[in-house]
Amino acid sequence: MDSADPQLARFLHQLQAETQRQKFTEQVHTLTGRCWDVCFSDYRPPSKMDGKTQTCIQNCVNRMIDASNFMVEHLSKMNGGSA
């Protein structure tokens, strides 16, 4: 196949985008697992959440959002888009 083939180029672009999405999803799962381990030391949520646990979860979620925004901006720049 010719490398200038537009269908091939489109396919390769879609493949790259899907690979990036998969890596992002794996990252989210990893971070979620880490936050769970940090915030719930006994691996199960308590019947009533105390202030310390609530703060831990809030901070963790905020860091995940920050990481997500960073990754979206980075992927957008890689694809030639604007953030």
From Swiss-Prot:
Example GO CC term: the record gives: mitochondrial inner membrane
Which Gene Ontology BP terms does the record give? mitochondrion organization; protein transport
Disulfide cysteine pairs (residue numbers): C35-C60, C39-C56
Where is this chain primarily localised? Answer: mitochondrion
Motif mapping: Twin CX3C motif? 35-60
The protein's UniProt keywords, in alphabetical order, are:
Chaperone, Disulfide bond, Membrane, Metal-binding, Mitochondrion, Mitochondrion inner membrane, Protein transport, Translocation, Transport, Zinc
Q: Where in the cell is it found?
A: Mitochondrion inner membrane
Is Chaperone set as a keyword in this record? yes
> GO MF terms on file?
metal ion binding
An example of a Pfam family matching this protein is zf-Tim10_DDP
Q: How does it sit in the membrane?
A: Peripheral membrane protein
Disulfide bond in keyword set = yes
Q: What is known of its domains?
A: The twin CX3C motif contains 4 conserved Cys residues that form 2 disulfide bonds in the mitochondrial intermembrane space. However, during the transit of ddp-1/tim-8 from cytoplasm into mitochondrion, the Cys residues probably coordinate zinc, thereby preventing folding and allowing its transfer across mitochondrial outer membrane.
User: What is stated as this protein's family in its record?
Assistant: Belongs to the small Tim family.
Q: What does this protein do?
A: Mitochondrial intermembrane chaperone that participates in the import and insertion of some multi-pass transmembrane proteins into the mitochondrial inner membrane. Also required for the transfer of beta-barrel precursors from the TOM complex to the sorting and assembly machinery (SAM complex) of the outer membrane. Acts as a chaperone-like protein that protects the hydrophobic precursors from aggregation and guide them through the mitochondrial intermembrane space.
Its quaternary organisation is: Heterohexamer; composed of 3 copies of ddp-1/tim-8 and 3 copies of tin-13/tim-13, named soluble 70 kDa complex. Associates with the TIM22 complex, whose core is composed of tim-22.
Name this polypeptide is given = Mitochondrial import inner membrane translocase subunit Tim8
The encoding gene is: ddp-1
